[in-house]
Amino acid sequence: MAVSQNIRIRLKAFDYRVLDASTQEIVNTAKRTGAQVRGPIPLPNKIEKFTVLRGPHVDKKSRDQWEIRTHKRLLDIVDPTPQTVDALMKLDLAAGVDVEIKV
């Protein structure tokens, strides 16, 4: 019994529009080369909040709050063909998207 090979792709970005465009580009490339795609699965967002003092010296009650939201997506490519792997290696994604690939 042969074990099927899967490729798991995790994408992270601060801007969800860029992330969704990159995800759609990967899905279209994989489907065009004959692979089956599971996903994109939206993963929970990571929200980091920072509180800083407005003034440099006194007035502790005056503060600013900032946050960074990290959006994540998960893709599984089931039984990829060699053409799929080549197409994914040559794919040029937008700047600001972090890609992690596990085979």
Curated annotation (Swiss-Prot):
Signal sequence segment: none
Gene Ontology biological process terms from the UniProt entry: translation
Keywords assigned by UniProt, alphabetized: Ribonucleoprotein, Ribosomal protein
Protein origin, superkingdom: Bacteria
InterPro entries: Ribosomal_uS10, Ribosomal_uS10_dom, Ribosomal_uS10_dom_sf
SMART domains per record: Ribosomal_S10
Pfam hit, one: Ribosomal_S10
GO cellular component, one term: ribonucleoprotein complex
Gene3D superfamilies: Ribosomal protein S10 domain
GO molecular function, one term: tRNA binding
Annotated family: Belongs to the universal ribosomal protein uS10 family.
Protein role: Involved in the binding of tRNA to the ribosomes.
NCBIfam families linked to this entry: PRK00596.1 (NF001861), rpsJ_bact (TIGR01049)
Subunit comment: Part of the 30S ribosomal subunit.
Protein name (record): Small ribosomal subunit protein uS10
Organism of origin: Jannaschia sp. (strain CCS1)
UniProt gene name: rpsJ
